[in-house]
Amino acid sequence: MRAKSHRYPESSECYTDTTYYDPEDKYLDIGFQMLKSINIKRYPEFSYLEKLFINNNNLKQLPDPQYLPKIKELVCSYNILTHIPFYPNLIKLDISHNQVQNINVYNQSKLLYLDCSFNKNIETRIFLPECRELYVNDANISKLEINYFPNLRILDCSNNNISRISSLSSLIELNIQNNHITELPSYPQLVRIMADNNKLCYVPTFPNLLSLSVSYNNIVKITDQPLLKKLVANNNSVIELGNLPKLKFFDLSFNKLNSVTIPSSAKYIFLQFNNFVSVDIDNCIGCVKELQVDFNIYSRIYSKYFDNIYAINIQTNRDKLHYYLQQYSQLSNEHIVNQILNKFNGIKFKEHTKKLFGISVGLYELIFVSQTIKNTSDKESYDKYFQSVLQTDYFKKFYEFIQYVYYNSIIVTLYFNGYIS
């Protein structure tokens, strides 16, 4: 877990002049104090401190190491620091959200925990043989040599420009989201991977993996994962699934699956917008809690599972809606899209035919009937004119289009076994 002041809120806009010192635990918390400098004379306890929280201030400089001879944990995030002194006994260091570009003074140090995230272009080529947790996300780096951290357990290098990452046998948790990585090497101990929004085409088998998140990649096949419990792989090109016998939660929406074998352990299933003819959940009907599908699949399985369905919720997917509305340039601006989204989401499904007709009438009048006619006609004449418009083939085609958009952009959530989110 990332370090922070545990007496004050996370918002950097919230300050208090309360200082807390715990002589038994040997820690001092002066976070959120709007401090521009630290007057050593005000804090005689510095010489005994093992933990110091000075986060969320306006500090440009840290105390000289001679005044903190026993310090082991230092949290100085959210300041304007450019340099970090060397504290020889330090094992935990959080310098996130500063302007530091170099921490070479800690090369071969005893650090177990290092958070240097949100320091643009920071140099990470330092050897930390004992480091267990490293956070270097949002740092605008393009390269990370993780072999410099041979005992690393947790790594977060998300939101960077990294294209390659090496293998490391000790790693159990990896976050590489929002990079340019094309390949995942072997990590024999890995338990959790977060690799969304990269350029992955393939995910190898990880024998101990419990959670895998790889949305927005180019993955075609999900390989065997013997212990995997959670899979989030939406917005890929998946056409094939390996053996996933322990899966409880899986999101494979927006892929290219023609069929899927759902494991008996599955509880939360998201399969909308694939190429299914139908979906069979007989194998997990006793334990499934939530199933999300598109309208096409819903219409095919509703009667089969009618007695098992506890509740139904229908929502419109905005991306799909916007995609279809682009066929009419007049419907593609953000205001109109949001208006239609809200109207679609307000439809009770048993009334959807009537509601869709009303929505079609309103939209057709808005974009196709000239303002001149509206302004120059009296109400009776205009109503008569508009009723004649509704009988034209142009309107009928438009109404059919709105129905098509609705049916192809809604997501139907089915709840089972007494569960509702």
From Swiss-Prot:
Q: Which GO terms describe its molecular function?
A: signaling adaptor activity
What name does this protein carry? Putative leucine-rich repeat protein R380
Record-linked InterPro entries: CDIRP (IPR052574), Leu-rich_rpt (IPR001611), LRR_dom_sf (IPR032675)
Q: Where are the LRR repeats?
A: 48-69, 70-85, 89-110, 111-129, 130-150, 151-172, 173-191
Q: What organism is this sequence from?
A: Acanthamoeba polyphaga mimivirus
What SUPFAM superfamilies would the database entry show?
L domain-like
Pfam families the record matches: LRR_1
Which UniProt keywords are listed? Leucine-rich repeat, Repeat
Query: Lineage of this protein's species?
Result: Viruses, Varidnaviria, Bamfordvirae, Nucleocytoviricota, Megaviricetes
Output the superkingdom of the source species: Viruses
